[in-house]
Design a protein with these regions (language model features):
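Cysteine-nucleophile active-site neighborhood
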Residues: 1-54, 60, 113-117
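Catalytic cores of nucleotide-enabled group-transfer and carboxylate-activating enzymes in metabolic
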Residues: 4-8, 20, 90-106, 122
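Active-site glycine-centered loops adjacent to acidic/histidine catalytic or metal-binding residues
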Residues: 15, 65, 103
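Short aromatic/basic micro-patch
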Residues: 36, 63, 101
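Conserved hydrophobic/aromatic beta-strand scaffold that supports enzyme active sites
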Residues: 39-41, 87-89, 99
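Catalytic beta-strand/loop cores that center a nucleophilic Ser/Cys/Thr
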Residues: 48-95
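Acyltransferase
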Residues: 101-129
Length: 129
């Protein structure tokens, strides 16, 4: 999978993909002190960046993880967090890399469709840029 991260295209890592991305770019993911399963509330950090554009600052997402990213890798910033997981979402705007600990594809993630639409728009902007 590492070869995909060398491509010059936007990439969205979800759950284990988020953790893999953190490892690839120089940080480790490890066992979560408090694994999360089911609905959880995340809070955006700042405006949440382009991935969370048009979504509220607090939202319900679906979690299913024993491991987590505890600190973002160099060049990445935290764009969403929760009480039990500091890095619910991260981004590196320069590389167009985004990681989500939660599952936007699950219906229980309130604004999952918006997140995917925003990612498609990020891809379109990268293609035209």
């Amino acid at each position: 999978c590492a070869e995909y991260l060398s491509l010059e295209v936007p990439i969205l890592g979800i759950c284990a993909g988020h953790q893999f991305m953190a490892r690839h770019y120089g940080w480790t993911a490890g066992e979560a002190p408090k694994p999360e399963f089911g609905a959880a509330t995340i809070s955006l950090v700042g405006d949440g960046g382009p991935l969370f554009q048009g979504t509220p600052s607090h939202q319900t997402v679906w979690e299913s993880h024993n491991d987590e990213v505890t600190t973002p890798p160099p060049g990445f910033t935290v764009i969403a967090e929760s009480e039990s997981c500091r890095v619910q979402a991260m981004q590196n705007g320069e590389l167009d890399r985004f990681g989500l600990q939660f599952h936007p594809e699950v219906n229980d993630t309130e604004f999952g469709s918006n997140i995917f639409e925003n990612f498609v728009n990020i891809c379109k902007s990268a293609k035209s840029g």
